[in-house]
Amino acid sequence: MADNLEPLEPSLQNLVEQDSLKWIFVGGKGGVGKTTCSSSLAVQLSKVRESVLIISTDPAHNISDAFDQKFTKVPTKVNGFDNLFAMEIDPNAGLNELPEEYFDGENEALRVSKGVMQEMINALPGIDEAMSYAEVMKLVKGMNFSVVVFDTAPTGHTLRLIAFPQVVEKGLGKLLRLKMKVAPLLSQFVSMLGMADVNADTLSQKLDDMLRVITQVNEQFKNPDQTTFVCVCIAEFFSLYETERLVQELTKCGIDVHNIIVNQLLFLQKSHDSCSMCASRFKIQEKYLDQIADLYEDFHVTKLPLLEKEVRGPESIRSFSENLMKPYDPKAEPKE
């Protein structure tokens, strides 16, 4: 039966045309070109969506290099685009990575809450990184972007990112259960410091608000109409092994994944002589491409070329992004 099935379109056109998608994650092993692929996908989405945000959660922050423009923890418009924005967060920095404006208020209550919240969170192992994502999600949801693309860190960090809603829900649940015990102590503490306008209700309300947002995000992450994951790999053993592990973990978490990008491929022309190394690499890639075809026959598998020049700058990414929408044809490559 499976042999009679038509192969799925070898592109990301299915994602670009799925206008219900809200969150798109792009991830894989380090060094496979995730940032180029996620940036290219964001560019294509900007053609059909009202507003697009790409977020780097990789401490290396490669999207600044990709677009040749410095980005910060505040969404910034990408040069050359009217509706594409980018921001970079460091998941290891916890709440300290958030824009200060987030904690602005008419008094010092929210600023004090930031410090108190950080201390309380530090008492719960493993939740700090997750809380950073949680706060970013709260910020992003308030900005009403049509779709958000995550340029994720290598696989281990990515799996933690995917799991963060459950971690935060569990952690916040513990904090809120302790709320009644903590509130009187916190009120006494701030009164001793002469800050009568600060009370535990401020912190409590903030935690309640965050839990509500994260519960909603958790539901959206597991809804294939709203969230999907794009795996990026190269045609080598370790990358393919990591991709299979990632696909299995995503499936276990209930995250939709049906697109794989195989990057940095050689497209040798039989009519041209090639060096022995190129021919050897080509054979290796062909072997793993066959394995990918067998493993992921029910996936959209997009094949991208290894280029002579690096893909950097908005115009270069805009040009490269076309390869996501239709199969790459080396014969159609413009001659210089």
Curated annotation (Swiss-Prot):
Its EC number is 3.6.-.-. Its main location: cytoplasm. GO terms for molecular function: ATP binding; ATP hydrolysis activity; metal ion binding. The keyword Transit peptide does not apply. The keyword Metal-binding applies. It comes from the Eukaryota. It is found in: Cytoplasm; Endoplasmic reticulum. It is an enzyme of class 3 (hydrolase). InterPro entries: Anion-transp_ATPase-like_dom (IPR025723), ATPase_ArsA/GET3 (IPR016300), ATPase_ArsA/GET3_euk (IPR027542), P-loop_NTPase (IPR027417). ATP binds at residues 29-36, 236, 263. The active site is at residue 58. GO terms for cellular component: GET complex. One of its GO terms (biological process) is tail-anchored membrane protein insertion into ER membrane. Zn(2+) binds at residues 275, 278. Keywords: ATP-binding, Cytoplasm, Endoplasmic reticulum, Hydrolase, Metal-binding, Nucleotide-binding, Transport, Zinc. PANTHER family: ARSENICAL PUMP-DRIVING ATPASE ARSENITE-TRANSLOCATING ATPASE (PTHR10803), ATPASE GET3 (PTHR10803:SF3). Belongs to the arsA ATPase family. ATPase required for the post-translational delivery of tail-anchored (TA) proteins to the endoplasmic reticulum. Recognizes and selectively binds the transmembrane domain of TA proteins in the cytosol. This complex then targets to the endoplasmic reticulum by membrane-bound receptors, where the tail-anchored protein is released for insertion. This process is regulated by ATP binding and hydrolysis. ATP binding drives the homodimer towards the closed dimer state, facilitating recognition of newly synthesized TA membrane proteins. ATP hydrolysis is required for insertion. Homodimer. This is ATPase ASNA1 homolog.
